[in-house]
Swiss-Prot record:
Keywords: Sporulation
Gene source species: Halalkalibacterium halodurans (strain ATCC BAA-125 / DSM 18197 / FERM 7344 / JCM 9153 / C-125) (Bacillus halodurans)
Family under the similarity heading: Belongs to the SspN family.
InterPro entries in the record: SASP_SspN
Protein known as: Small, acid-soluble spore protein N
Pfam families assigned to the protein according to its UniProt record, in alphabetical order: SspN (PF08177)
Annotated GO biological process: asexual sporulation; sporulation resulting in formation of a cellular spore
GO cellular component: endospore-forming forespore
Induction: Expressed only in the forespore compartment of sporulating cells.
Primary site of residence: other
Region called Disordered, residue ranges: 1-46
Subcellular localization: Spore core
Keyword Repeat: no
Amino acid sequence: MAKMKHGSAQFRPDHLGTQPRKSDANKGKKMNTKGNENPQYIPPKG
């Protein structure tokens, strides 16, 4: 079991910054990191 855990650590490390696959699958994170794109909905003023 210990070997398996160590092997999976290479593919999925504890650091969030080194998990591009996880953030890709996480739609919530995608929506949260929409800083570069323009907002789809702009509330009317007034």
